[in-house]
């Protein structure tokens, strides 16, 4: 709390102590501005001071006057992707912004699996890091800080992607941005605002959590830590709110591990968080997120329930989920090292859904409905592409239960886009589960290589007792 107070005090002191034109940290040299859109440039100055903004992409001068609160803002229309450009902002002083690109800008947020970089220990990235001199990709790393109320500025700066800067930046975000750059052939700006260990509550405006009894109660169950905040709104206020004037194309999100203990309210919380961000940006942002990978949690099935909650969030328009139950190299490590496939899958989803490109295997198969005929169950799915396939034994991971709610392993057969199941122990099937546990590794894929999301067809009570 003291750090938050000092940060806020510093910003106020800084803004009031100098009668010069100033910019927020996110507006600077090396930045990427969203193409073919109206973007905002804003800052602070002396009330009544005239501010002129000139850009090298159109050569015109846009003018405004600092208002009575010491703030100014200019709206600029950006052209199609290109650059580098320059921007000159002139008041009582002059600020020159150099090496500015225009392209696609994405915010990347969540907890440690989004924060995870090459320097955290990902030797498989070595070749990609060595080839990462990609000046068309730019990074903005938001420094980790909290605040009691929404802030107007934050700490961070833009940098050019190279073999050094990439080592410290989110691996998932890098691979996401690289695939976008490869396929769209436009500059990509990546803003990383992530913090390991954080629950979704702290990335959500506090009033949204506190005014909902169920969300407020769930937030009180979160485990405190000296290393990351858990208080509703704290990271939203300090790390997201200051960015909401900055035009972006969309958001990617990798989080959920710290909410496994409150999975029953997660879909409501997460959906509310997404809607709050969209309201803040005044845009229905595409929002693509990563499903939890297999991991040995201390309580049974809590990750399965959280994954289920993540899938429920797909009810929101312009959302998408990346399934990762095939990417866990070690289920005792909460940080799977394969970040490349995660980033690429996020990018393929964005390329297909946001940019309308014909991308094969952009979506994972999802359970749709089932049909029972005697002792046989037929499962139907969405997003199956050209069909389904199995790696290894087809029935692995499938379980059937009757009305007694006792689950037994099933024998499975794939027929194009459907799967049929039977079990000698279940004569009248009532429910099916697939990979529905903390550590289950999936082996059913679309023929395009995308893993089937874990699911259950029932809504029965799930055992979440401690693992012994």
Question: What are these model-predicted stretches?
Answer:
Residues 20-468:
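Cell-envelope and extracellular/periplasmic
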Residues 1-22:
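Bacterial Sec-dependent N-terminal signal peptides
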């Amino acid at each position: 709390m003291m750090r938050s107070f000092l940060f806020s005090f510093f910003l106020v002191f800084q803004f009031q102590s100098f009668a010069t034109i100033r910019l927020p940290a996110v507006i600077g040299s090396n930045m990427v501005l969203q193409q073919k859109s109206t973007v905002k440039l804003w800052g602070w100055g002396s009330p009544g001071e005239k501010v002129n903004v000139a850009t090298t992409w159109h050569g015109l001068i846009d003018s405004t006057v600092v208002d009575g609160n010491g703030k100014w803002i200019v709206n600029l229309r950006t052209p199609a992707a290109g650059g580098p450009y320059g921007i000159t902002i002139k008041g009582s002083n002059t600020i020159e912004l150099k090496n500015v690109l225009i392209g696609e800008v994405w915010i990347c947020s969540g907890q440690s699996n989004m924060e995870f970089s090459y320097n955290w220990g990902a030797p498989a990235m070595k070749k990609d890091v060595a080839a990462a001199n990609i000046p068309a990709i730019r990074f903005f790393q938001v420094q980790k800080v909290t605040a009691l109320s929404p802030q107007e500025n934050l700490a961070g700066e833009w940098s050019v992607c190279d073999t050094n800067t990439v080592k410290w930046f989110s691996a998932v975000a890098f691979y996401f941005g690289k695939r976008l750059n490869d396929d769209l052939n436009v500059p990509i700006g990546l803003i990383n605002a992530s913090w390991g260990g954080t629950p979704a509550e702290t990335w959500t405006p506090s009033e949204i959590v506190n005014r909902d009894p169920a969300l407020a109660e769930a937030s009180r169950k979160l485990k405190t830590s000296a290393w990351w905040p858990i208080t509703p709104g704290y990271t939203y206020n300090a790390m997201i709110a200051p960015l909401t004037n900055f035009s972006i194309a969309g958001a990617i999100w990798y989080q959920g591990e710290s909410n496994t203990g409150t999975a029953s309210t997660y879909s409501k919380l997460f959906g509310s968080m997404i809607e709050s961000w969209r309201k803040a940006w005044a845009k229905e942002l595409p929002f693509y997120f990563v499903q939890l990978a297999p991991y040995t949690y201390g309580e049974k099935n809590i990750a399965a329930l959280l994954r289920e909650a993540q899938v429920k969030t797909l009810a929101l328009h312009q959302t998408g989920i990346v399934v990762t139950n095939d990417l866990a190299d070690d289920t005792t490590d909460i940080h799977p090292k394969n970040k490349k496939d995660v980033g690429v899958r996020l990018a393929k989803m964005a390329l297909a859904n946001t940019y309308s490109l014909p991308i094969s295997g952009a979506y994972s198969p999802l359970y749709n409905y089932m049909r029972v005929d005697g002792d046989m169950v037929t499962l139907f799915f969405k997003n199956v592409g050209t069909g389904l396939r199995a790696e290894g034994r087809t029935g692995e991971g499938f379980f059937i239960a009757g009305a007694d709610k006792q689950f037994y392993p099933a024998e499975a057969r794939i027929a194009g886009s459907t799967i049929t199941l039977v079990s000698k122990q279940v004569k009248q099937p009532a429910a099916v589960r697939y990979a529905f546990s903390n550590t289950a590794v999936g082996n059913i894929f679309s023929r395009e290589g995308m893993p089937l999301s874990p699911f259950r067809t029932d809504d029965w009570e799930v055992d979440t007792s401690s693992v012994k």
